[in-house]
């Protein structure tokens, strides 16, 4: 590969990290995965049962919780150095969950099963403590603002951090004037800018939602095509989940946090959680004496902002995400645009994780100029073009104001990511990252190898609707997890964690002091009180 293709900055950083004294640093990256999935009946319909008590408390269990709906499970791994260990942890959580699910299944793809009427989709319930009620009212607000149907879409979140010792090393080499914390935050914001530039590539390579159940759109007008009586699709789509049919929010339309620095990012979110939005004001926070939303602002809380990647910092009890970021800077990023691959029991595999590491390292170490002119808008339109028609032959994207063929740009990007994969391999003493990259290059050369193409091919081969295909995959994965149970010790550890979480919730509820209305007021004030 010609080194001249890489930026001077990237070459310098590659050389520095390739030095013997620094090489082991890259083994210290941390990886965490969150996987959402709907609980469904044997007929592939939404399970209307409460969150199984044997899985513990959705409020306090660190590994098994619920997302939007009582029927939408979320599995959370610890952050580990080797993504193979992260996936092994996710696998064990699935096996434990299946030991308690009775005759229910975990729905394998991102797009939901046929859903009941909006009012019959149960909102996740977290008990009577103030924090539990806050989570519940927040979800009521989401239903009011966006409808419940959209909230039933599931995804994979990939949490990734570079080693803390890496930043002072780069900072010193580059003569950055300022604190280590400021350098680290600006480097993560630079990663996010590059992610915005290049994340369309992930949608082509890993998008796996080209079709959905026809009832999902609830009769709204759309540009999708009919595949069969029960299925809508787009022939060249990679990820309808990430297209504009997924989340449409007029309120959030004007909210495009600028990723120029951490301050401007937290600033725009702070304004959004403190700025009233007329249609929400009209509804108010209460109806018939009951809370219906936490407030009438553009965002109820900062996590309501919908984005493909988020800067993150672990929060202390009672602390808000913005407070943590402003106080202690960025600690890791959360990649939120990955579809669940319905052919994989976990929805993601080690090859995808190894490639993501190389891709994110490329985003972190490559030049990342500030967005200028219409570059931010182009990043959004490139992303939307690929999710809707990424496999269309000859598809063109915009690069620095010029049209470029997507496949040509994809191949060039993979060529530039190759030295990062090689560096990771050198650090780990293996060739797994380079092999993962080769597998992605094969998809660029042949679009039939992409998961989105394979979903449509499988449905066509078996003459199945989206729901029939998805149920078949869900049943196959259930068999996979149930065929190999956890060891007695592992099962006992999960059961103990579930039991402890229920005790914690009870304790929270019994020791609760103070009125919920006052609690919400204090929660609101905590944002307004932050001064730059």
From Swiss-Prot:
Key words of the record: ATP-binding, Glutathione biosynthesis, Ligase, Nucleotide-binding
InterPro entries (UniProt xref): Gln_synth/guanido_kin_cat_dom, Glu_cys_ligase, Glut_cys_ligase
GO molecular function: ATP binding; glutamate-cysteine ligase activity; metal ion binding
Annotated Gene Ontology cellular component terms: cytosol
Enzyme class: ligase
Pfam families documented for this protein: Glu_cys_ligase (PF04262)
Transmembrane region(s): none
Disulfide bond sites: none
One Gene Ontology biological process: glutathione biosynthetic process
Pathway(s) this gene product operates in, as recorded in its UniProt entry: Sulfur metabolism; glutathione biosynthesis; glutathione from L-cysteine and L-glutamate: step 1/2
EC number(s) on file: 6.3.2.2
Signal peptide boundaries: none
Family: Belongs to the glutamate--cysteine ligase type 1 family. Type 1 subfamily.
Protein name stated in the entry: Glutamate--cysteine ligase
High-level lineage: Bacteria, Pseudomonadati, Pseudomonadota, Gammaproteobacteria, Pseudomonadales
Gene name of the encoded protein: gshA
């Amino acid at each position: 590969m010609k080194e001249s293709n890489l930026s001077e900055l990237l070459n310098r950083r590659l050389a520095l990290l390739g030095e013997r004294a620094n090489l082991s640093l890259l083994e210290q990256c941390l990886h965490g995965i969150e996987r959402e999935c709907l609980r469904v009946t044997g007929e592939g319909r939404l399970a209307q049962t409460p969150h199984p008590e044997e899985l513990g408390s959705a409020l306090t269990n660190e590994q098994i919780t619920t997302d939007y709906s009582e029927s939408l499970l979320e599995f959370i791994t610890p952050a580990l150095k080797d993504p193979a260990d992260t996936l092994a942890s996710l696998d064990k959580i699935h096996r434990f969950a299946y030991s308690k699910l009775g005759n229910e299944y975990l729905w394998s793809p991102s797009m939901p099963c046929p859903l009941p009427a909006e009012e019959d989709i149960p909102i996740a319930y977290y008990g009577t403590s103030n924090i539990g009620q806050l989570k519940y009212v927040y979800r009521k607000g989401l239903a009011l603002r966006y409808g419940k149907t959209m909230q039933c879409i599931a995804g994979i979140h990939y949490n990734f951090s570079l080693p803390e010792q890496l930043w002072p090393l780069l900072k010193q080499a580059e003569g950055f004037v300022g604190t280590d914390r400021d350098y680290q935050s600006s480097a993560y914001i630079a990663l996010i800018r590059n992610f915005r530039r290049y994340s369309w590539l992930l949608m082509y390579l890993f998008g796996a939602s080209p079709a959905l159940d026809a009832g999902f759109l609830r009769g709204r007008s759309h540009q999708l095509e009919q595949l069969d009586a029960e299925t809508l699709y787009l022939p060249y789509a990679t990820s309808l989940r990430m297209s504009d049919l997924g989340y449409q929010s007029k309120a959030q339309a004007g909210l495009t946090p600028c990723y120029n620095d951490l301050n401007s990012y937290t600033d725009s979110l702070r304004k959004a959680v403190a700025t009233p939005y007329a249609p929400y004001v009209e509804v108010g926070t209460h109806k018939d004496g009951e809370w219906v939303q936490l407030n009438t602002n553009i965002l109820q809380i900062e996590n309501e902002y919908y984005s493909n990647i988020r800067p993150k910092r672990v929060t202390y009890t009672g602390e808000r995400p913005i407070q943590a970021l402003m106080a202690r800077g960025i600690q890791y990023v959360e990649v939120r645009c990955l579809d669940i691959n319905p052919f994989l029991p976990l929805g993601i595999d080690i090859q995808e994780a190894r490639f993501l590491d190389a891709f994110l390292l490329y985003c972190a170490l490559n030049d990342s100029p500030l967005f200028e002119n219409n570059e931010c808008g182009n990043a959004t339109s490139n992303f939307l073009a690929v999710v809707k028609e990424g496999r269309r032959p000859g598809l063109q994207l915009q690069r620095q104001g010029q049209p470029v063929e997507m496949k040509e740009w994809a191949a060039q990007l993979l060529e530039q990511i190759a030295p990062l994969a090689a560096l990771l391999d050198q650090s780990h003493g293996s060739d797994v990252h380079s092999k993962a990259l080769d597998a992605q290059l094969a998809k660029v050369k042949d679009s039939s190898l992409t998961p989105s193409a394979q979903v449509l091919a499988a449905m066509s081969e078996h003459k199945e609707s989206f729901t029939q295909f998805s149920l078949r995959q869900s049943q196959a994965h259930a068999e996979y997890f149930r065929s190999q149970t956890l060891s007695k010790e592992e099962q006992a550890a999960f059961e103990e964690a579930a039991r402890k979480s229920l005790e914690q919730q009870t304790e929270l509820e019994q020791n609760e002091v103070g009125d919920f209305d006052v609690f919400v007021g204090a929660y609101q004030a905590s944002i307004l009180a932050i001064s730059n």
